[in-house]
Structures are given as structure tokens and as C-alpha cells.
Amino acid sequence: MNSMNPMKPALPPAPHGDGSFAYESVPWQQSATQPAGSLSVVTTVWGVGNATQSQVLGNPMGPAGSPSGSSMMPGVAGGSSALTSPQCLGQQAFAEGGANKGYVQQGVYSRGGYPGAPGFTTGYAGGPGGLGLPSHAARPSTDFTQAAAAAAVAAAAATATATATATVAALQEKQSQELSQYGAMGAGQSFNSQFLQHGGPRGPSVPAGMNPTGIGGVMGPSGLSPLAMNPTRAAGMTPLYAGQRLPQHGYPGPPQAQPLPRQGVKRTYSEVYPGQQYLQGGQYAPSTAQFAPSPGQPPAPSPSYPGHRLPLQQGMTQSLSVPGPTGLHYKPTEQFNGQGASFNGGSVSYSQPGLSGPTRSIPGYPSSPLPGNPTPPMTPSSSVPYMSPNQEVKSPFLPDLKPNLNSLHSSPSGSGPCDELRLTFPVRDGVVLEPFRLQHNLAVSNHVFQLRDSVYKTLIMRPDLELQFKCYHHEDRQMNTNWPASVQVSVNATPLTIERGDNKTSHKPLYLKHVCQPGRNTIQITVTACCCSHLFVLQLVHRPSVRSVLQGLLKKRLLPAEHCITKIKRNFSSGTIPGTPGPNGEDGVEQTAIKVSLKCPITFRRIQLPARGHDCRHIQCFDLESYLQLNCERGTWRCPVCNKTALLEGLEVDQYMLGILIYIQNSDYEEITIDPTCSWKPVPVKPDMHIKEEPDGPALKRCRTVSPAHVLMPSVMEMIAALGPGAAPFAPLQPPSVPAPSDYPGQGSSFLGPGTFPESFPPTTPSTPTLAEFTPGPPPISYQSDIPSSLLTSEKSTACLPSQMAPAGHLDPTHNPGTPGLHTSNLGAPPGPQLHHSNPPPASRQSLGQASLGPTGELAFSPATGVMGPPSMSGAGEAPEPALDLLPELTNPDELLSYLGPPDLPTNNNDDLLSLFENN
């Protein structure tokens, strides 16, 4: 018999090995003393035997898959009469708590004292695959329908790992009968026929009837067929499992009497449940060993229950090698599938109700068509590296966790920590590898770059910084990501999955910092066809989360209602409000009223935060968050209403429209009309035309950050209400002539750029369009923050952008003293630091001339030369690259940066992202 060891090489060491518990194959020692009748259940790992199904079936493998003759647990089976007694066999190593369908076949071997005493008798009640090991094909859910089934599944995982040694003598008689029963192992059926088939060869060969799952059944005796286990496993395996060897299934390889060495048995279960040693001393240690007394606990060979048992098996990685009482120790993986698979103490009641679900096949491992012939694991390609079984033990296995087939190291392209949507901006002089072409017809090329320790640490600590590697067509001036189909990339020997999407415009760049290391890094590019038409570039990029940008814009670009009104009136008076659907929209024709939709032109749902570009001449707004999300992947930054360029730093949040939206937020209105005096009224919805909006909103609205109602002061809402239907316009605006403290310190002042809002702008008469010309370009960035100090302070302490989002409540003016009035006496004051707000949040004030950068140094890099060592390219020509000089400039440092982070950190405009990179 070939021991399973030879297969060992097939299992690459798990990348996440447990250190001392390497996948060492632990040979099962066979004790000469073991009675021929005893059989052991062993789960073997990926060793693939040549044995065919018949072989497997023929071998009277113990439940563990070891030949019945050999005692997998030498110590246990060997001399221990206890095990020998049928009782022991009866106990299933693991109670399959599953659906209560443990392999409870009471009967045959159940040991009286053993709680749950169901014996192994129950084959894996899996139905055709007595073992419940679905053959490679997915096991029909019905397989597990039997009472034993559900539990079996769960238990199977567990049981597969436990070795049950017991005498089979008594069973022999039934064996032949039961084999036939395998297919339908009823709860009452005994495992014995299968697992116990002792009698050596006598084990009946499994009839085809065993069938796919039969295989599994067969496996029981001979060892679970690897794949059989797989399929189910596979899915369940999730990448975690996928990579792992499926330890449990003994591959039918070794003939019966031979002990199957446990390959891949990684750690003794004892680590986890030391006390529970199955088969301890030949008997289940009564104390802990008893796996859930749930109904029969099937012996170890778990049939491949779809994925569920996988975990056990893995977790079980028991070192069967331990002779003697140790038997297998199960490390229960915490709940498997999170479904009740908790091994209580020793109870492995895996209740996996879902087991019946279709089995999932493990990616990377072919399923072998013949039940008896396990297919050796294929070397997982870039997709799923072998993973250490431990992982399961560490975290509960969620019920239907699907493996991420992309790869362990798939690049987090569009999503950063917290899976937040992120915008991407190049950092000036942040190019690490200048755009390069591949050498003609060079299949594999290596490109080396250096990362200093300080740079590496900064990258890792800052979720908003990334190393972006992308490919683009040489004629594309926009450098939009486009990956030729034949390109494959790996970094430091870690294959990366390229997201190409459905069309060439949806390709995504790779983000490499998670696979980089301090010092030398190598990008290996493999192509199967010439890619001379494309260029590759590696650059540092700033990737702030949409939430942080949204917050920055709310603070810096919330255009006060009075200014919005003035702007609208000016546009009415000029007779040019392009892009609005109202009547008489032609230039030079006086407009009486304009219809404005309350729906975002991007999502066609009610706008939450109304915004426009600074240069837009229309009243119609779009939803700010939807617009930011729209520009996450390929930032075109064009207004969806008029198609003018609307860059991030030029966006304005319209407080007037926001007030209207809040005022009618609980109604179904879809449009309003606005007249030249800025009075507004809702347009009634025609009942037959109206389709109620879905309450949950569009998919884009995932990061709804703040409740817009909290952004407006009560006085603003009074003004909006006054402008609404039936109210005297502007009435509420008179009182503000007395400056009221406001946490929107100087709404106007924040826009007082040179010539932007003249000092003559009278706070008490917003209706007069005295706002001189709006400066053609976006106002300077150093706007004072326009939101309550509570929000500002909450951000000061946060270092990670995703966490900077203050709860919506923080924006609620009622939480901040001094927020009552919208107007401040400073509206007419000259721009600059001398703007004194009645209630300035001390820490948040800074002179207008200073760019605001967050405490995290959001995008602040001070000039650092040679931060990244000279990158060199090898393979496509070893031309060394000059050292990368990261200059102190960002794409629009004065304009962009202050929007992206909290404004608490005064920094020089010359500072930029690279300031975080140390020079040493």
C-alpha cells in the first residue's frame, strides 16, 4: 500500500502555516497488536492514491478510511480492547449535531455509556454516499435530508477527522447488507458496513449505486475520496479551504491494512481541545472526548459534506499520528459556517442545516469524475494559494461564505479599508516607475523598485495612500486603465488578479501596497502576446474616501442660502439659465418661473445633498455623493446637467435647495417651481404618472454620510419656509440684521475670496443681487469651515479618514451652543483672518490664507528628495531609473487638499503629501 505520504509534496506548505505545525505527514503507526477486526477512521489529507473506487470500496477501510485491519491509532486500536468493542465503534467520533441527524445509527456500535451512543452504525447518513461524501458532484440536498444527513454533514466534517477504532467483528455479518444500504443509510443504518467494513478486503466493493455520494461512502472505508470531499468542501472551502488539503478524506489509496499516514495533519487537536481526545486510550475519553452526544457520531471519515465539514476537517487537522490515547484531537473550528457548528467542548455537533445545499467545488482542484480515484490537487493558480487550516479555527465560518476565487491577494481596486468607495488623485512627482513599454516579444519581464522603510510605513499606516500600477494605451492622453487580455502581473511572487470588467472602460488598476515590502520590490509582468501598444506606470496616488471628501465639501463648499438666492436672481435677471427645463428658457426672454427637478440626474432619485459646479448657470442640482461615486473609477468630473467641467474643488453645495428639500422631505413632490424672486412652490404630482420612489434608495447611496437636515440652521429653514408657497418672502431675513452667533461662521465669509463676494454684500438684504461677479475660477480653498464645531472637533482626533465621519447628530445645530443664527456680522467684513465669528470654535479657526490639512496629514507631503530609491527595471532592459524626487506639490495643492481633510492643521501651501515621507 502506498502510504499517503508520497502525496505530501502535492501540498505546498500553507502560506499561513502554523509554524511548528507544518503540514507534516504523520504516519499512522499500525500496532501489530491491533486486532484484525478493529478499524480506524482516519482522515487523510491531499495525498492522492491511485486507488480506484473499487479499490476504495474494496478496502475495508475503517471509518477513518484506514483499512480496517490497521489501527490508525496504534495506541488506541492496538491494544485497547475498549476500542475493539463494538461499543466504541458505535460511538461516532463526532456527534453530528447537524440536523440532529447525527450519524445516528444507533445500534450497531453504539456504546452504551457513550452519550448519544448512536453507533457508527449510521453510515454517513447521506443517502447514496453512505458516507455522505458527495461524489464530486454536488450532493443533492436530499442526501442530507435524512435525519442523519444534516448532522452527518456537520459531523462528517468533524467525524472525518476523528479516528474511531473498533472491532468490526460483529459488524462483518451486517456488512454486506449494509453496504447495500449505504446509499440510503438510514438513521438506523450502521456505519459499519462502510466504515467498519473490516474484514479487510472483504469490504464490499461499492456498487455504483453508492454513487456519487456513494463514493463518499466508499470513501469512508477506504478513505474519503479526496475530491469527493472536495466538491462539497470546495465550496465550503472558501479560499480558506480551498487551498487546504482536505484532510479528512482518506484517499482511498492505501489498501486496507496499511496505516494511512496522516498527511497534512497539521496540529494535534489537542491543542485546542486537549481534553478531547478521541479514541483516547482506545476509548473515547469519557470526559471531554465525547463529542456531542448528539445522535450517533459518525466516525471520522466524514463523507464530503459540502464544505461544511470541511472546516472540521481542517480544524481537526488532528495529528492522528499520536498513538495512544491521543487519538485525534479535534480542534474544533469555531463554528463551522457559523451554523451551530460549534464544537461544544468536545461536542462536535455540527449542525449544519445547510449541508444539504449543493456542494461547492473547490476552486483549483479538479473534481475527479471517478469516485474512487481522487484527483490530486491542482496547483492553484494565481487564484487560491493553499491556505492554512488554522484560519478556520480562528474565525467562525459563516454559513454561506463563498470563497473569494479571485485570489488571496486580489487588489483592492475600488475599495479600501472598510470597503469604502475612494476617489483617486495622482500625487505630483509621485511616479515610482516612469511609464514604460515591454520589450517586444519578451514573455516575462521583471521591474524593480525600492521602498524605504519610512515610505513603506507611511503607506501602510495611511489608508488614503496607495501605490497604483496600471496599464494604458499609448495614445490615451487620459491614461485610462486598459489591460491587454494577455497580461498577468505578480508582485514579489504574489499573483494579482486584474479586474477587467465587461468592457475596456471598466478595467481597474492594481493597488500594490498590500503586497509590497520595505526595500526591493519586483513586479513581474507575463504576456502571451505583444503589448507594445501599451504603457505601464507605477505611481503614488491619494485615495481619500468618498465620505471624507463629502465632509470636506460640506464644510468648505456649503454655499450660504443668501448667496444661492443672489446667484439665482442674477441668472434670472440676465435671462440666461441654461440647462433648466422651465418655460421661456431662451436667452434674453424674461422668465417667469423655472421648474427644477428634485431628482438627481445621475440616480433619478430624490437628491440628498444638492450640488452644482461653480461655473454652472442652472438652478438644477445633482446629488453630491452620487456625483463623487460616479467619479470614483474614471473621474471625468463633468456636470451631468450641462456637461461643463465641474471639478472637485469647484463644487458647491446649494443651501437654498437643501433647505427646500428638507422642507418637503416627507412629501412625494418631484419638482418645484422657482420664480425670479426666489419664491418656490412644489409642483403637484399627477397621480397617474407618479411612481413612488423605492424607500431604500439606489445602490450608489451606500455611504450616506449626514442627514442634510442637520446642516441647516433654524433661521435658514425659516427663510426657506418664508419663500415657500403662501408666505411673505424674506420676512425672516430681517431679524438677522442683528448678528446672531452662528456655527456656520460667516457663511459668506468663507467665500470672500478676492473679488468674490464684495464687502458691500448686505447681510440683511439677501434679495439684492449685490454679489458682484462670482470669480470665474473656483474660490480659494482656504474657506473657513461651515459646519458646527462639534463636527470639526470630532474630526480632529481621527487619524483614519474612514472614521472621520462624524455621526449625523454632530451636525445637528441643536447640539452646538451658538448655532441659532445663520447670519454673522462679518458678511460685510473684508476677507481674511480678521473675520471674527461670534462663536468661533477655537481649534477650527485658521487664517483664510492657510490651506487646511487634516491631522492625518491628509495629502500633506513635505518635499522629500529621493524618498523612493532609484527604481530599476530588469528583464525589459536593466536600465536603472533615476532616484524618485518627490516634490512638494500635489495636483492642486491649494485647492484640492483643503477639501479632503479636517481644517484643523494649518500647513503651508507648499506642503503636500510627500511631507509624510521621511527623508532618512
Curated annotation (Swiss-Prot):
GO terms for molecular function: SUMO ligase activity; transcription coactivator activity; zinc ion binding. The modification Omega-N-methylarginine is found at residue 111. Residues 1-22, 54-79, 243-265, 286-391, 803-920 are annotated as: Disordered. Its main location: nucleus. It is found in: Nucleus. Coiled coil: none annotated. There is a cross-link at residues 402, 457, 692 (Glycyl lysine isopeptide (Lys-Gly) (interchain with G-Cter in SUMO2)). Zn(2+) binds at residues 616, 618, 639, 642. Keywords: Isopeptide bond, Metal-binding, Methylation, Nucleus, Transcription, Transcription regulation, Ubl conjugation, Zinc, Zinc-finger. Pfam families: zf-MIZ (PF02891). Residues 435-506 are annotated as: Interaction with AR. Residues 334-354, 906-920 have a biased composition (Polar residues). Residues 60-79, 380-389, 876-890 have a biased composition (Low complexity). GO terms for cellular component: chromatin; mitochondrion; nuclear replication fork; nucleoplasm; nucleus. The modification Asymmetric dimethylarginine is found at residues 245, 262. InterPro entries: Znf_MIZ (IPR004181), Znf_RING/FYVE/PHD (IPR013083). GO terms for biological process: positive regulation of transcription by RNA polymerase II; protein sumoylation; regulation of transcription by RNA polymerase II. A zinc finger (SP-RING-type) spans 585-671. Residues 295-304, 366-379 have a biased composition (Pro residues). Expressed most abundantly in testis with lower levels in heart, brain, pancreas, prostate and ovary. The C-terminal proline-rich domain possesses a significant intrinsic transcriptional activity. This activity is inhibited by the N-terminus in the full-length protein. Interacts with AR, SMARCA4/BRG1 and SMARCE1/BAF57. Interaction with either SMARCA4 and SMARCE1 enhances AR-mediated transcription. PANTHER family: ZINC FINGER MIZ DOMAIN-CONTAINING PROTEIN, ZINC FINGER MIZ DOMAIN-CONTAINING PROTEIN 2. Increases ligand-dependent transcriptional activity of AR and other nuclear hormone receptors. This is Zinc finger MIZ domain-containing protein 2. The gene is ZMIZ2.
